[in-house]
C-alpha cells in the first residue's frame, strides 16, 4: 500500500504544477503590454528589411560587375563580324586608318590593312554587346590577339594572307 500512496502523491504534485501554469496564463492575459516593446519588434523588422535590401543591392552590383567583365571578352564571332564590316567599308571607299598611311598601304592586301587597324586600335567599327557600344579598344587585348592569331592561321592555310 505504500506504493499506492507514492503514486497518489506523485499525481497530486502534477496537478499543482498545472494549476501554477494556469495562474501564470491569467497573469499574462491581464497584464498590460508596453507599447515600446511592440515598436522594437517593428524596428527590428524594418532593419531586417533594410539589410535585405542592401544585400540585394550588393548582389545586383556584383552581377553588374560580372556583366562588365564578360562584356570585355570578345568572341570569335564578334571579331569575325568586325573584320567583315571593316572589309566591306574599305571596299566601298573608306580610307584605312593606320598610323603610317602611304601609297604602299593602298597597295597592300586589304586583310593586312584590317588586321593592322585592329592591332593599332584605330578600327572604326563599333559593335553593341550587352547594351553597350564597344570598339576594339574596349575589349580584352589578350583575347583579341588570340582570336586574330587564330584567324590569321586559317587565312594562311587558305593562302589568303
From Swiss-Prot:
Induction pattern: Expressed in the early phase of the viral replicative cycle. Expression seems to continue throughout virus infection.
Q: Which reaction does it catalyse?
A: RNA(n) + a ribonucleoside 5'-triphosphate = RNA(n+1) + diphosphate
Keyword list (alphabetical) reads: DNA-directed RNA polymerase, Early protein, Nucleotidyltransferase, Transcription, Transferase, Virion
One cellular component (GO) term of this entry = DNA-directed RNA polymerase complex
EC number in record = 2.7.7.6
What's one GO BP annotation on this UniProt entry? DNA-templated transcription
Keyword Transcription in annotation:
yes
| Primary localization | virion
Region of interest: Disordered: 1-35
Where along the chain is composition biased (Acidic residues)? Answer: 1-32
Record-level Gene Ontology MF annotations: DNA binding; DNA-directed RNA polymerase activity
Classification via Pfam families: Pox_RNA_Pol_19 (PF05320)
Quaternary structure and interacting proteins, as annotated = The DNA-dependent RNA polymerase used for intermediate and late genes expression consists of eight subunits Rpo30/OPG66, Rpo7/OPG90, Rpo22/OPG103, Rpo147/OPG105, Rpo18/OPG119, Rpo19/OPG131, Rpo132/OPG151 and Rpo35/OPG156. The same holoenzyme, with the addition of the transcription-specificity factor OPG109, is used for early gene expression.
Family per UniProt? Belongs to the poxviridae DNA-directed RNA polymerase 19 kDa subunit family.
Report the protein's function. Answer: Part of the DNA-dependent RNA polymerase which catalyzes the transcription of viral DNA into RNA using the four ribonucleoside triphosphates as substrates. Responsible for the transcription of early, intermediate and late genes. DNA-dependent RNA polymerase associates with the early transcription factor (ETF), itself composed of OPG118 and OPG133, thereby allowing the early genes transcription. Late transcription, and probably also intermediate transcription, require newly synthesized RNA polymerase.
The identity of this protein, by name, is DNA-directed RNA polymerase 19 kDa subunit
Source organism per entry reads Monkeypox virus
Q: Which gene encodes it?
A: OPG131
Amino acid at each position: 500500500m505504500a506504493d499506492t500512496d507514492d503514486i497518489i502523491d506523485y499525481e497530486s504534485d502534477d496537478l499543482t504544477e498545472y494549476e501554477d501554469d494556469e495562474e501564470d496564463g491569467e497573469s499574462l492575459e491581464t497584464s498590460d503590454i508596453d507599447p515600446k516593446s511592440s515598436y522594437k519588434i517593428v524596428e527590428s523588422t524594418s532593419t531586417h528589411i533594410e539589410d535585405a535590401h542592401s544585400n540585394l543591392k550588393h548582389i545586383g552590383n556584383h552581377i553588374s560587375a560580372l556583366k562588365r567583365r564578360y562584356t570585355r571578352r570578345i568572341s570569335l564571332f564578334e571579331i569575325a563580324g568586325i573584320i567583315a564590316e571593316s572589309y566591306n567599308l574599305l571596299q566601298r571607299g573608306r580610307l584605312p586608318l593606320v598610323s603610317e598611311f602611304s601609297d604602299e598601304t593602298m597597295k597592300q592586301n586589304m586583310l593586312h590593312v584590317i588586321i593592322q587597324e585592329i592591332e593599332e586600335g584605330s578600327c572604326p567599327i563599333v559593335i553593341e554587346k550587352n547594351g553597350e557600344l564597344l570598339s576594339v579598344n574596349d575589349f580584352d587585348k589578350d583575347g583579341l590577339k588570340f582570336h586574330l592569331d587564330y584567324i590569321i592561321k586559317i587565312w594562311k592555310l587558305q593562302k589568303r594572307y
